[in-house]
Amino acid sequence: MTSGSLWKNILLFSLPLMGSQVLEVLFNLSDVAVVGRFADYMALGAVGSTTLLVTLFTGILIGMGAGVNVRVAHELGAENRKGTEETIHTSLLLCAIAGLLVCVVCLLFSGQMLSMMNTKPELMDQAVLYMKIYALGMPAMAVYNFGNGVLSARGDTKRPLIYLSIAGVINVLLNLFFVIVCHMAAAGVATASAIALYISAALVMIHLLRRKDECRVSLRKLRLHPKACKAVLLLGIPTGLQNGIFAIANLFVQTGVNSFDAVTVSGNAAAANADSLIYNVMFAFYTACASFIGQNWGAGNKKRMLKTYGISLTYAFIAGAILGGLLLVFGPQFLSLFATEPAVIDAGMERIRIMGFSYAFSCFMDCSIAASRGIGKSIPPTIIILGSCVFRVIWFYTVFAHFQTISSLYLLYIFSWGITGFAEVLFFAVSFRKIRT
């Protein structure tokens, strides 16, 4: 990370990570595809109604993993073995605690949260059951994201891909078994996902327990070191809050979608799968950006940090533009993976026609946030994100309230990404100039 061609190294680092991110998304995609094809559109709508809640809570856990990634990268770049070990063992405890807390919240309040989102009464029972079962896998997700963060900071993105590939295949097979054979519908796919999450967590932990370098986990060394705890939380909590704040703002979008009929809700659920798929391909370059900048920040190489930002931004924009364009061309075929009813596919295309042009522009926001996190700045970007979400809420109560069309609801994404992207780029530029190496 601190030497060699950045164009080549960032791409080679990102490709396995991209595969890992996409496979993680495929856990939920396989849920939606199986219930859409082998259950009915009611089950599809029920699973789709939980998407933003799942995104909210998994975003918090992913944020913690991102904090671990950057802090470990800082210590590795500075060649601080003791600091690396303390960060790793502290982080494992913090992530496990976070996963348990998220699980408890989901188990206790899923029904109330889904009601606040105006989930259709006919979808409610299956949606609540799906959410509660899926929540049981949250502790495992937290542990996996911890391990992924550590390995990515070390430059190893291949092992997480292998582990998720194994868990992903098992997830799909269990989905088919529980839905087709056991007729469990939404509950079946949630159970399959929870089991797969524990398999991926177990695989990554077995590897970390067997490592021989400074990234090895020893159960006897598990404790909360104050300095490492503070550093990880200062990076992880704001990052998790960024994900959570966006998810909360998106609850207004889901509430707006839920005000339409069940066909529109199901079409939106099918099309929204493209969001997570494309975003996570782009997210691989953001993780690379934070990891490479983090190590070079620890090594004191300012020029290489700036070049990392530019290259990561370029890769992410190209990926978003290509994938968005492909989705515009092959949207109906993509949607047919998750739904069979023509009306549902038509409703999904309304979202795709707008979002396909929008994805690439989100990179200015997200890559700049990752770059700021790489230099240890995570609180101001979170405040900027909060402002962006206020904009989304205002849009919901003004533009959408005026037009009352599904298109006016979807357009808020590109406008909020543009405004936030400008602010995040400006903040990183100012912060970078103040760095002394």
Per-region residue spans from a language model:
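Small-residue-rich hydrophobic transmembrane alpha-helices
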Residues: 44-104, 141-160, 267-331, 362-384, ...
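Short alpha-helical transmembrane segments in multi-pass integral membrane proteins
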Residues: 1-14, 72-139, 181-237, 293-358, ...
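Short runs within selected transmembrane alpha-helices of multi-pass transporters and secretion channels
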Residues: 65, 134-152, 160-168, 189-204, ...
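Helix-loop interface residues and adjacent transmembrane-helix termini in multi-pass membrane transporters
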Residues: 26-29, 38-41, 75-78, 153-154, ...
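Juxtamembrane/transmembrane-helix interface segments of polytopic membrane transporters
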Residues: 24, 28, 32, 36, ...
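Transmembrane helix-bundle signature of multi-pass secondary active exporters and lipid flippases
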Residues: 17-70, 134-141, 230-295, 316-323, ...
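Transmembrane alpha-helix boundary and packing residues in multipass membrane permease domains
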Residues: 17, 21, 33, 70, ...
